[in-house]
Amino acid sequence: MTTQSQPMSQKTMVKKRLHTQEVLRLTSSQGKQLEVAKGVLWVTQEGDPQDYLLHAGERLIFERRGLALVQALTEAAYCLSQN
């Protein structure tokens, strides 16, 4: 996975929300971008030994196949798009 702090393009962004401790399950995450608009998200992905903490303004590009879990550590808003 690659983390970046630059905003992604507006092409296919849809802002969604997660409540504190709520979990988003992504079964086909490869090629997707996750950008945090508000709050803090914890991200882990099958086959990746590293976990990620993303804060508002940061984004992550999923480079592996497999299940990814995204958990809100605070009230959060995010955008998920295809890379």
Located regions from the model:
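A short, N-terminal "cap"/entry segment at the start of jelly-roll beta-barrel domains
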Residues: 1-8
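Short, surface-exposed secondary-structure edge patches
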Residues: 15, 33, 50-51
